[in-house]
Curated annotation (Swiss-Prot):
Source organism of the structure: Escherichia coli (strain K12)
The gene coding this protein: fdnH
UniProt name for this protein: Formate dehydrogenase, nitrate-inducible, iron-sulfur subunit
Gene Ontology cellular component list: formate dehydrogenase complex; membrane; plasma membrane
GO biological process, one term: anaerobic electron transport chain
PROSITE patterns: 4FE4S_FER_1, 4FE4S_FER_2
Cofactor: [4Fe-4S] cluster
Length: 294
């Protein structure tokens, strides 16, 4: 992918605006497609992520499931999720690669109060700039997928970057390169949507009538998409939300109420200025002067 697609179009806690849809270059937008029907849960993608990003999580404890590590962390940016479900009287073992979805309308970026701590590139990748992170955790609350994780060692938040450093020089993400079954694909979003529809058609031909593409509209679509056997029940895949949306409080705080808050601050500041000009500064009165007036 060309370097020019790395132009930043959004920064947290700034007034940068997303270009209108009619002028966005969809050919420049990238996406990762994960076909859960061909994933074997080998965790090669987890290892590749750890190796490329030079992150090492602590050795955990067995909690009675195949998930290892048991959850995402500041040092585990992707994990395999294993779920058992019964469909039509048959047991199904569903596997899903979990990690940042790189939303087109990222709740983490909207919620973040630190200027430039979270950015979004023109190609759709959402990236954390750790040097600007203040560790407030608002991005965690703003994410409808519960992805960002706080590192207690440096009090900064981390997540999958979609290997933005590799993508910027024309390489695919490390997890895509290492997948032995070709379950993970990478390219332009247009290409990935076309490929996803082909995979869905094959799944439906095999009897999965509810197969579909997971690209939720509630967050403007995502740059990490899934092909699911049971797209009508995404929650079967370890709680994947059916209709994820940015929390109303975040939308109000950083949306409709933001101008009001700014106006309130300006009005307060102006009031202080007028008070100073019209009345002058408050004077301190000592005890002797106060007794004299009495």
């Amino acid at each position: 992918m060309a370097m020019e697609t790395q132009d930043i179009i959004k920064r947290s806690a700034t007034n940068s605006i997303t270009p209108p849809s009619q002028v966005r270059d969809y050919k420049a937008e990238v996406a990762k497609l994960i076909d859960v029907s061909t994933c074997i849960g080998c965790k090669a993608c987890q290892v590749a992520c750890s190796e490329w990003n030079d992150i090492r999580d602590e050795v955990g404890h067995c909690v009675g499931v195949y998930d290892n590590p048991a959850d995402l962390s500041a040092k585990s940016w992707t994990v395999m999720r294993f779920s058992e479900t019964e469909q039509n009287g048959k047991l199904e073992w569903l596997i899903r690669k979990d990690g940042c979805m790189h939303c087109e309308d990222p709740g983490c970026l909207k919620a973040c109060p630190s200027a430039g701590a979270i950015i979004q590139y023109a190609n759709g990748i959402v990236d954390f700039q750790s040097e600007n992170c203040i560790g407030c955790g608002y991005c965690i609350a703003g994410c409808p997928f519960n992805i960002p994780r706080l590192n207690k060692e440096d009090n900064r938040v981390y997540k999958c970057t979609l290997c933005v450093d590799r993508v910027s020089v024309g390489q695919e993400p490390a997890c895509v390169k290492t997948c032995p079954t070709g379950a993970i694909h990478f390219g332009t979003k247009k290409e990935m949507l076309e490929l996803a529809e082909q995979r869905v058609a094959k799944l439906k031909a095999r009897g999965y009538e509810h197969a579909g593409v997971y690209n939720p509209e509630g967050v403007g679509g995502t740059h990490v998409m899934y092909v699911l056997h049971h797209a009508d029940q995404p929650e079967l895949y370890h709680g994947l939300p059916k209709d994820p949306k940015i929390d109303t409080s975040v939308s109000l705080w950083k949306g409709a109420l933001k101008p009001l808050a700014a106006a309130g601050f300006i009005a307060t500041f102006a009031g202080l200025i007028f008070h100073y000009i019209g009345i002058g500064p408050n004077k301190e009165v000592d005890d002797d002067e106060e007794d004299h007036h009495e």
